[in-house]
Swiss-Prot record:
GO molecular function, one term: 3-beta-hydroxy-Delta5-steroid dehydrogenase (NAD+) activity
Family: Belongs to the 3-beta-HSD family.
Active site residues per record: K159 (proton donor)
Taxonomic classification: Eukaryota, Metazoa, Chordata, Craniata, Vertebrata
Membrane-related topology note: Single-pass membrane protein
GO annotation terms (biological process): androgen biosynthetic process; C21-steroid hormone metabolic process; estrogen biosynthetic process; steroid biosynthetic process
Protein name: 3 beta-hydroxysteroid dehydrogenase/Delta 5-->4-isomerase type 1
Organism of origin: Homo sapiens
Tissue localization of expression: Placenta and skin. Predominantly expressed in mammary gland tissue.
Amino acid sequence: MTGWSCLVTGAGGFLGQRIIRLLVKEKELKEIRVLDKAFGPELREEFSKLQNKTKLTVLEGDILDEPFLKRACQDVSVIIHTACIIDVFGVTHRESIMNVNVKGTQLLLEACVQASVPVFIYTSSIEVAGPNSYKEIIQNGHEEEPLENTWPAPYPHSKKLAEKAVLAANGWNLKNGGTLYTCALRPMYIYGEGSRFLSASINEALNNNGILSSVGKFSTVNPVYVGNVAWAHILALRALQDPKKAPSIRGQFYYISDDTPHQSYDNLNYTLSKEFGLRLDSRWSFPLSLMYWIGFLLEIVSFLLRPIYTYRPPFNRHIVTLSNSVFTFSYKKAQRDLAYKPLYSWEEAKQKTVEWVGSLVDRHKETLKSKTQ
């Protein structure tokens, strides 16, 4: 496609930034529109440095602002929709999550139709598939298995509804008489430089004598490096613009993993930080079944206090299940249809992430140093 343009929502986020860095290398791409609620000065400067033959246009606005979305979509060839509220701990109000993640996606699809944008790629989540029970074991799962998250928690529920809306929109008629083609990518838990979940775990450990909190010692998962997830998006947009490949991809979803070893969340955090003296918590912990029922009791307490006080439990049944299940998936379908092969090996991904973790450790040391002066 000659002289095409791409809109990336959530472009200021952990994944969005990595997609932009790869997008600027695409041939015949004349413009990238980077959309988010707000961009800090450092990120604006980074985007300006990325500009070469490809124009980068920064768009600050609300995903629920219909006129703004219609303007953003004008003369765009491809949309990569990563923008969403990620919240597994119940900090954000349910209505806000549903509005941004579901209504925002629906409004963007409608703007696509009005602006006649033919390609729409949605960043979904592994949580769309589950896990629904820590007793359920899924190893090397695939797209043909009828897996669907049944938790009422707002984040997985909203991502499930949004993905369904995106895939149902495949084949819609566009205003110019063309057709809208869509697909969705379901990445595993994403790690890498800039991960706020990994950053929170490391900083918490640094403030706790180097002891990493146990978040999922009973789990077996296959986390995916952020650079490989970004690469999968590039391959998806290429494939949906390829007349030979596109028919088998339209309306489909794909699990995105890589060659990161299958391990627990706790072991991943330890592997990425042990070089700096951080260590796993060796203290005795409650059995998983007991943790599940304690989570249930905390939910009841939260519900009973709701009329007079907002109590957010440290964990609930959903978090216990999410963090302690055997839940791994294959990327064979993405390999077959998208020609997906991880851009970064496990060793490369580990090295880059460990270097970034080292910068967090150095920053912590500098903070302590300044406090003692």
